[in-house]
């Protein structure tokens, strides 16, 4: 008889226990991850940045709304009007519509899209320095400034709407988001708050092998709550002072296991691209999207709620195309998300100055080999429960927390941060 001491428990083995995954789908997603491997020779590592902005009314606005209230998509002088005014400054070939509704714009270096509550997300082309991000962001602000002033809108870079309630913010006319809103309204806590009224900063990094990807995912997942605490920026929740030190973390903790939080099985010794692919394929899709699935070309309802169906239930028995893969991955919101790059997702929206400090810190920790080795050594051997303890400790004890048994000043020194969040390096 085996004893507990003899057994090697792999966390992943106890997720998705029916193993209902199509082998061709599994290979498609694993190949998608493999295709993201960059050549380390002569490649310093790129940085992708997305900044979400909360649109609120200015003091002197044309609809006489109270200052600071959320601006929705369809209202008079709303976000749709802002996008329409910007069209001439962006590439017509990159306009994004759903039906007659303009939902996105793009040009070289910059892509504008909308989050469910009309939050304006700006995604930038890959940069290799903080200066590159600052130049692109200045271009974005210069382009959008006159349209914002005309419609009485200002962009707030915080984690949550300062005055408005989430229930007062309409979801934009995108079927995927309306399905998600309905799903989260019944299947989770705080899901609608996250969708309609929150905003974040996300930073993406490259990987140079499967082993490098796993190491960066583990280190990013372990250090993420600490960095989230140092860069926290959600002073408000539902029109009041926020009772949560880490509001965004509180949302994701309650939205659903496997779909959010720590990637299942990440700290198992055998975790790799195949397990990452299993995670996204075996989970219920939440939203099924077959708009780019040729076999469903005549489907009258190509985007629908899929509360129980997973990829094998929805997509044909063949290799998945890139649109299908990207959609399946996008229905998961783990702290660190693997695509054909690694997306670090812990942070509230931040002003550009603080975003630059965060970017410099991330670049140093994940691309300086000596710094990465040192940072990883302090979280080596941890488990998922240790990450959860770290999150809870920061939420409960704040400055007195001891992430992984060490005081916050230790982590500041390791990450090269001053107490005000300025990156000073090591």
Q: Which sequence ranges carry the predicted segments?
A:
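Short helix/loop capping segments that flank catalytic or ligand/cofactor-binding pockets
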Residues: 63-64, 130-132, 213-215, 228, ...
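Loop-rich catalytic cores of soluble enzymes, especially ATP-dependent carboxylate-amine ligases
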Residues: 149-150, 154-337
């Amino acid at each position: 008889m085996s004893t507990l001491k003899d057994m090697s428990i792999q966390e992943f083995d106890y997720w998705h226990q029916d193993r209902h995954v199509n082998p061709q789908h599994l290979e498609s997603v694993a190949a998608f991850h493999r295709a993201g491997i960059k050549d380390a020779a002569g490649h310093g590592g790129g940085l992708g940045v997305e900044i979400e902005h909360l649109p609120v009314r200015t003091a002197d606005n044309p609809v006489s709304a109270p200052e600071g209230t959320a601006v929705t998509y369809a209202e008079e002088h709303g976000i749709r009007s802002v996008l329409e005014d910007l069209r001439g400054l962006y590439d017509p070939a990159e306009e994004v519509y759903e039906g007659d509704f303009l939902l996105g714009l793009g040009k070289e270096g910059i892509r504008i899209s909308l989050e469910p509550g009309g939050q304006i997300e700006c995604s930038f082309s890959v940069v290799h320095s903080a200066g590159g991000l600052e130049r692109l962001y200045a271009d974005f602000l210069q382009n959008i400034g006159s349209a914002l002033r005309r419609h009485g809108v200002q962009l707030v870079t915080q984690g949550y709407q300062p005055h408005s309630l989430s229930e007062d913010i309409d979801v934009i006319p995108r079927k995927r988001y309306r399905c998600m809103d309905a799903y989260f309204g019944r299947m989770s806590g705080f899901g609608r708050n996250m969708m309609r009224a929150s905003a974040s900063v996300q930073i993406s990094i490259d990987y140079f092998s499967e082993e490098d990807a796993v190491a960066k995912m583990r280190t990013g997942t372990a250090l993420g709550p600490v960095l989230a605490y140092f860069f926290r920026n959600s002073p408000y929740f539902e029109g009041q002072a926020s009772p949560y030190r880490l509001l965004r973390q509180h949302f994701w903790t309650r939205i659903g296991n496997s779909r959010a939080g720590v990637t299942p099985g990440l700290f198992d010794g055998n975790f790799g691209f195949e397990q990452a692919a299993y995670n996204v394929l075996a989970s219920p899709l939440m939203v099924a999207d077959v708009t780019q699935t040729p076999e469903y070309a005549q489907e009258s309802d190509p985007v629908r709620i899929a509360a129980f169906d997973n990829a094998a239930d929805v997509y044909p028995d063949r290799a998945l195309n890139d649109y299908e893969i990207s959609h399946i991955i996008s229905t998961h919101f783990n702290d660190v998300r693997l695509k054909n790059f690694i997306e670090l997702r812990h942070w509230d929206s931040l002003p550009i100055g603080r975003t630059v400090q965060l970017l410099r810190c991330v670049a140093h920790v994940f691309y300086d080999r000596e710094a990465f080795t040192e940072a990883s050594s302090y979280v080596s051997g941890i488990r998922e429960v240790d990450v959860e303890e770290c999150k809870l400790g920061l939420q409960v004890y704040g400055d007195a927390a001891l992430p992984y048994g060490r005081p916050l000043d230790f982590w500041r020194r390791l990450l090269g941060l001053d107490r005000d969040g300025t990156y000073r390096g090591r």
